[in-house]
């Protein structure tokens, strides 16, 4: 928006927005929104996910006023469009006119429209639905538990078998491309390791869409099988049928981390199965196929951005879609094993694994052969781009990664050192010269730091919008409707801490990795995901239901306490301390309590959540968190 008579911006009266800024579905129903405005823009935030592949309309009327009482006016181009003779309009303008007319028709009782538009949401399900169908027909185990796949015994409460899973692979970065097409040159990574930034396509190289959703399998000969760990009760005879748990690890984790929560399951006669996500554990890539050079390691452990790839949002979307497809393949392949109780399979995901598990659960719906008895999400969230940028721990890493990227540093070198960083100069020449210039004086270092701050300020708004738009079709915010409608038995654990409005030293902080909410977006974090899944608060020591669909809010520890007792109360740094002594004992008890909650949910098929120590649980629910 701009003023009609000057460059000055006139702040809008927020009280005039309601009833005059309308988001309407194709049936004429108003969509609940949160409205805000400045003198330059009106911001419409949806309070819940819009339906996929659905048409919506926006109408703004002259009832919107500035703080001085002046009514909003239409831009002249809008007025010309709606007053023109349709026969005199170009085909593009005719289509635009029809969209505007349909939008205005949806708001017959609104005031005089000064803006109207129509849009259709992505068909966010199409590609993953296609992947599910491929998994159902292709996924199978290439080996099974036996003498040759049994690993040495680590503990006395489980046996471990390591087998191979044949699962469709869609990412362009296959193992064959490591040697010839990837060299981790930090000065020019996008050009020296192009496969890392590529994305899933169709067979003909196009973007998968609802019109052509089937992705290309990039390893059609299944040269690379997924190493699958199967933990079973000690002394299992390989015949007795076992209920089974699928575990999904977090970012920088790997399938072996499941060992910290096994005992509650293997002691009770369960098998626990785990695989690695792309760029994790056994699925690491290496530049030049050089596995002996740590500088050539392409893994989330070495650099989170290799998986959370905001430099290539389509690659990030593909990484998430591949992860969902892999676990759907695992679930499908379990049906071929005689010892698996096919109707007694459960899902547990932690952190990124919790985020991914929301989508795994969603795409298991309406397929009896993919059913999960319970779905358990530990510290997940939604709105992934804004989630990262509101995370205590991920935001600083992300900002520094962007500021220190070769793109930003090359641009600064071209500005500050034009005689050195010419068009012909390589990235390495430019960036090395910039670093030398920076080291010459504190004044130079301060100037570069200030310019990097300015660059980030310009990049962040585009990052929020552009990256999130791209990854919407691999974000749990888009995938809650099927499991909610079907009443999927669900337990979600949220780390809320025990602070008041602000945290003091000695108090347990809310989740410092996946924020529970974000001030700048009502759809970011764990709380909006809880709302989207329609989960009820669980505050009592034992909750019975048939089935349970609930959330336990945790006051002790933090993001990773379900697996490890490493997050103590906040210290002087403003982050969780490393607990010792009695505090360690208390946090360790919180870990035990959380693991028992999930184990009881699984063991009772979603009928009970046992809370053995209420000291670790929020027993009073804030009004905004009530169902």
Short names for language-model regions:
Residues 333-389:
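Primarily recognizes the serine-hydrolase "nucleophile elbow" in alpha/beta-hydrolase
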Residues 385-386, 398-556:
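Serine-hydrolase catalytic core
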Residues 1-177, 186:
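Acidic, low-complexity Ser/Thr/Gly/Pro-rich repeat segments typical of extracellular/periplasmic
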Residues 490-493, 497, 517, 529-627:
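C-terminal catalytic histidine-bearing segment of alpha/beta-hydrolase fold enzymes
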Residues 182-183, 192-225, 237-328:
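Cap/lid segment of the alpha/beta-hydrolase catalytic domain
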Residues 34, 55-57, 67-78, 130-133, ...:
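Short, solvent-exposed loop/turn and secondary-structure capping segments
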Residues 247-251, 350-354, 495-497:
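Glycine-rich His-Gly loop
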Residues 128-129, 140-244:
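Domain-level recognition of soluble alpha/beta enzyme cores
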């Amino acid at each position: 928006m701009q003023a009609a008579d000057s460059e000055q911006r006139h702040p809008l009266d927020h009280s005039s927005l309601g009833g005059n800024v309308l988001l309407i579905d194709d049936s004429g129903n108003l969509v609940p929104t949160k409205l805000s405005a400045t003198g330059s823009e009106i911001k419409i935030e949806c309070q819940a996910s819009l339906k996929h592949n659905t048409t919506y309309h926006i109408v703004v009327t002259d009832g919107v006023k500035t703080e001085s009482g002046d009514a909003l006016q239409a831009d002249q181009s809008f007025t010309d469009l709606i007053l023109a003779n349709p026969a005199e309009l170009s085909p593009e303008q005719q289509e635009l006119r029809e969209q505007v007319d349909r939008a205005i028709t949806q708001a017959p009782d609104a005031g005089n429209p000064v803006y109207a538009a129509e849009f259709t949401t992505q068909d966010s399900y199409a590609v993953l639905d296609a992947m599910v169908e491929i998994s159902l027909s292709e996924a199978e185990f290439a080996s099974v538990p036996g003498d040759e796949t049994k690993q040495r015994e680590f503990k006395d409460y489980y046996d471990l078998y390591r087998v191979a899973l044949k699962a469709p692979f869609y990412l362009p970065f296959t193992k064959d491309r490591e040697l010839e097409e990837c060299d981790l040159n930090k000065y020019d990574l996008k050009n020296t390791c192009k496969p890392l930034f590529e994305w899933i396509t169709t067979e003909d190289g196009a973007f998968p869409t609802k019109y052509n959703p089937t992705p290309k399998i990039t390893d059609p000969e299944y040269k690379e099988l997924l190493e699958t760990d199967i933990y079973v009760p000690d002394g299992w005879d390989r015949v007795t049928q076992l209920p089974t748990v699928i575990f999904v690890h977090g970012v920088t984790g790997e399938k072996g981390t499941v060992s910290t929560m096994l005992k509650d399951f293997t002691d009770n006669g369960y098998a626990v199965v785990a695989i690695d996500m792309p760029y994790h554990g056994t699925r690491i890539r290496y530049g030049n196929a050089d596995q002996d050079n740590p500088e050539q390691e392409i893994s989330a452990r070495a650099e989170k951005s290799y998986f959370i790839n905001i430099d290539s949002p389509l690659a990030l979307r593909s990484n998430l879609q591949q992860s969902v497809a892999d676990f759907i393949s695992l679930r499908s392949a379990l049906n071929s094993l005689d010892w698996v109780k096919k109707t007694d399979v459960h899902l547990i995901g932690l952190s990124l694994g919790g985020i991914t598990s929301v989508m795994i659960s969603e795409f298991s719906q309406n397929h009896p052969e993919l059913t999960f008895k319970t779905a358990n999400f530990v510290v997940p969230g939604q709105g992934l781009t804004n989630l990262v940028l509101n995370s205590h721990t991920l935001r600083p890493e992300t900002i520094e990664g962007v500021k220190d990227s070769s793109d930003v540093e090359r641009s600064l070198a071209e500005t500050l050192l034009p005689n050195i960083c010419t068009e012909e100069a390589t990235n390495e020449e430019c960036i090395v010269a910039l670093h030398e210039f920076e080291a010459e004086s504190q004044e130079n270092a301060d100037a570069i730091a200030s310019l990097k701050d300015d660059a980030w300020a310009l990049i962040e708004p585009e990052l929020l919008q552009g990256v999130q738009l791209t990854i919407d079709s691999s974000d749990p915010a888009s995938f809650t409707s099927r499991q909610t409608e079907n009443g999927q038995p669900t337990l979600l654990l949220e780390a809320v801490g025990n602070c008041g409005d602000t945290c003091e030293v000695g108090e347990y902080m809310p989740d410092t990795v996946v924020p529970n909410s974000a001030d700048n977006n009502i759809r970011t974090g764990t709380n909006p995901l809880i709302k989207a899944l329609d989960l009820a608060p669980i505050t009592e020591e034992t909750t019975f239901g048939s089935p349970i669909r609930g959330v336990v809010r945790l006051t002790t520890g933090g993001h990773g306490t379900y697996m490890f007792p490493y997050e103590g109360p906040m210290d002087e740094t403003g982050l969780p301390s490393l607990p010792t002594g009695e505090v360690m004992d208390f946090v360790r008890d919180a870990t035990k309590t959380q693991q028992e909650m999930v184990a009881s949910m699984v063991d009772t098929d979603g009928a009970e959540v046992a809370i053995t120590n209420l000291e670790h649980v929020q027993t009073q629910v804030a009004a905004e968190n009530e169902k």
